Amino acid sequence: MKQIVKKLVESLPVVSDYYAYHWLFPRRVNAFRGLYSSFDEALKAVPSQTLTGYNHAELHDAPVRLNCTQADMETLNPIDYPVLVWLHKAFEDSSIVCDLGGNTGNSYYAFRRYIPYPENVQWTICDLPEAVKSGEAMRQRTHCPGLSFTTDLATVENAEIFLTCGTIQYMNASLPDFLGHLKNRPRHLIVQRVAFYEGEEYFTLQNIYGVYVPYKIMNDANFVASLAALGYELVDRWSIDRPCVIPFHPDRFVKGQ
């Protein structure tokens, strides 16, 4: 009976949206709701009793809390295979990496099973304090040459490779604006797991394990053009089958990331 009711609800657009907005969103990880014109507006829409932002230990300390081994950390997410291709190529002439939002070192550990790192690699993860704290704890327990952690965005100034996997959509500032203010820009940019579509940029809210965070959906063409204006050339792109569905706003649907 429950399945019949569920199918009926999902088949009626308005009812389905109401169900997704009020019932599914608080209960489902990575669910979305709301349409906002700015980061601050989205932030104000978070209920007062709900955690917001990404700087919470429970979002970053799983590897330490679960006593993960080095082998556990080296598990590759299949959606990151395209990153391996271009990081390997970037390592031909570069060895200094700034991994923005690299959490506890997920990419550093996973990628090295598949591609050789330069002997002089410097891989700096720039993230929030709680992520850095957990990352440092893991670093003490593993063999990880060249890996370091920081909360200082100035690290990007020295980077030759700028890597970010699923982070810039949580930032208020745009990546092109941020890079545009640097005196020394990275030679290579690798941007992964970011939601783009053809419409006007907007913010929504995402549920991440009970924490509500503003989430930016960017205009594809504008993003590419802004980076091109800084001298960067788009050499490849790929899509991940992870849609963003915003209840009551079918025109803001994002097919993949």
Residue ranges, per PLM feature:
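Conserved beta-strand signature within the Rossmann-like core of class I S-adenosyl-L-methionine
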Residues: 186-203
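Class I SAM-dependent methyltransferase Rossmann-like catalytic core
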Residues: 40-93
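Class I SAM-dependent methyltransferase SAM/SAH-binding core
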Residues: 104-146
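A short SAM/SAH-binding and catalytic strip from SAM-dependent methyltransferases
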Residues: 160-174
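A short, conserved alpha-helix within the catalytic core of class I
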Residues: 170-185
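Conserved class I S-adenosyl-L-methionine
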Residues: 94-104
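Membrane-proximal basic amphipathic "stem/tether" segments
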Residues: 1-46
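Short alpha-helix
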Residues: 213-239
